[in-house]
Amino acid sequence: MSPHYIGTMADAADHDAGQDVRLRARVEGVVQAVGFRYWTVRKAEELSLTGTVRNEDDGTVAVVVEGPQSVVLEFRRWLGSDDAPGRVDHVEESVSPATGEFSSFDVVY
């Protein structure tokens, strides 16, 4: 684990809300073939976040998103809400400092 690992979004609340963070999320449920990636891109772009979203072979969706901690928290809440397409049963997450690796938010195939 990186020495800069923060934990979950709940743990990140103890940090500066303006600090840029990276959220890695694995979304479980009925999240493939329901437009989940498309809506995830739209939500990330609406919030001016960067990162990627991709379908995994096990039926989950992997999301990596970077931006200000308070905005990433809003995005994380959306990921697990009824507003997200399909049916989200569980979101596994980890948070670390942002790397600045991304310049946009894209679907990875």
From Swiss-Prot:
Active site per UniProt: 37, 55
Domain Acylphosphatase-like: 22-109
GO terms, molecular function: acylphosphatase activity
EC number annotated for this UniProt entry: 3.6.1.7
This protein's record includes keyword Signal: no
Catalytic class of the enzyme: hydrolase
Keywords: Hydrolase
InterPro entries found in the cross-reference section: Acylphosphatase, Acylphosphatase-like_dom, Acylphosphatase-like_dom_sf
A Pfam family matched in the record: Acylphosphatase
PROSITE patterns per the UniProt record, alphabetical: ACYLPHOSPHATASE_3
Enzymatic reactions: an acyl phosphate + H2O = a carboxylate + phosphate + H(+)
SUPFAM superfamilies from the UniProt entry: Acylphosphatase/BLUF domain-like
Family label: Belongs to the acylphosphatase family.
Protein name: Acylphosphatase
Organism: Arthrobacter sp. (strain FB24)
Top-level taxonomy: Bacteria, Bacillati, Actinomycetota, Actinomycetes, Micrococcales
Annotated gene: acyP
